[in-house]
């Protein structure tokens, strides 16, 4: 049977030491917060207070130091290499910026990632990257990122980059933001809320419907932040591709239950995260 590849996404992995911790618990993907200074430079991997219930909100690194640690964790042959870690979501905290700084934020982000993660295109980290943007008005971050990689001579690295708008906006409005950004493909759609609160699956189901329709723009759907077995099963039953969690071992446990093992498998590097799964 054709099984849906699943991404177990470790939530709020902001210190280099946490990469090992989350992957060892079963995550094949991590989510990292990126804060910006007032000139739109990515500054720290930092969430801050408040954050998810039961988590320390204040772990951090300088962004470039995190990128170097992440590169080691995703470069075959490195002593810190994890074969399993195949996707990284950068949760871009652009709320501190003016809307007209989005392009610059994308440009500066691209320069940092190119140098410290991709090693200027010379055997850098291999993980796929999702740029997750909280505000539809900041779609020019994508443009700035893309144009910078091109002007720096590495347009091919865009093959490793996907996108997400994380504001739980109306799906049609999300589609329009991608039109404005000139994006076709590589689209992950998030839906969710902090683990301190409950959220139903109605918008997830809407996103799944878009993903599975012949004219949809979404390739993958993920739900956050899921820490309990029952809510994991509900999300899998709704057909998500990814689940973001504080407890990767809980998600891995559910995926190993016979009902889910028959229909899902843990995604590997050979699973293209920009490809819509066809049953």
UniProtKB/Swiss-Prot annotation:
SUPFAM superfamilies with a match to the protein in the record: PLC-like phosphodiesterases (SSF51695)
Location of the protein in the cell: Secreted
Record's GO cellular component terms: extracellular region
Annotated CDD domains: GDPD_like_SMaseD_PLD
Residues engaged in binding Mg(2+): 31, 33, 91
Names of required cofactors: Mg(2+)
Keyword terms, alphabetized: Cytolysis, Dermonecrotic toxin, Disulfide bond, Hemolysis, Lipid degradation, Lipid metabolism, Lyase, Magnesium, Metal-binding, Secreted, Toxin
A GO MF term: lyase activity
Domain of life: Eukaryota
Tissue: Expressed by the venom gland.
Reaction catalysis annotation: an N-(acyl)-sphingosylphosphocholine = an N-(acyl)-sphingosyl-1,3-cyclic phosphate + choline; an N-(acyl)-sphingosylphosphoethanolamine = an N-(acyl)-sphingosyl-1,3-cyclic phosphate + ethanolamine; a 1-acyl-sn-glycero-3-phosphocholine = a 1-acyl-sn-glycero-2,3-cyclic phosphate + choline; a 1-acyl-sn-glycero-3-phosphoethanolamine = a 1-acyl-sn-glycero-2,3-cyclic phosphate + ethanolamine
GO biological process: killing of cells of another organism; lipid catabolic process
Pfam families the UniProt entry points to: GDPD_2
Magnesium is among the record's keywords: yes
Catalytic residue list: 11, 47
Coarse class of the protein's main subcellular location: secreted
Intrachain S-S bonds: 51-57, 53-196
Listed EC numbers: 4.6.1.-
Cofactor: binding details: Binds 1 Mg(2+) ion per subunit.
Family: Belongs to the arthropod phospholipase D family. Class II subfamily. Class IIa sub-subfamily.
Function: Dermonecrotic toxins cleave the phosphodiester linkage between the phosphate and headgroup of certain phospholipids (sphingolipid and lysolipid substrates), forming an alcohol (often choline) and a cyclic phosphate. This toxin acts on sphingomyelin (SM) with high activity (18.3 U/mg). It may also act on ceramide phosphoethanolamine (CPE), lysophosphatidylcholine (LPC) and lysophosphatidylethanolamine (LPE), but not on lysophosphatidylserine (LPS), and lysophosphatidylglycerol (LPG). It acts by transphosphatidylation, releasing exclusively cyclic phosphate products as second products.
Record protein name field: Dermonecrotic toxin LrSicTox-alphaIB1
Originating species: Loxosceles reclusa (Brown recluse spider)
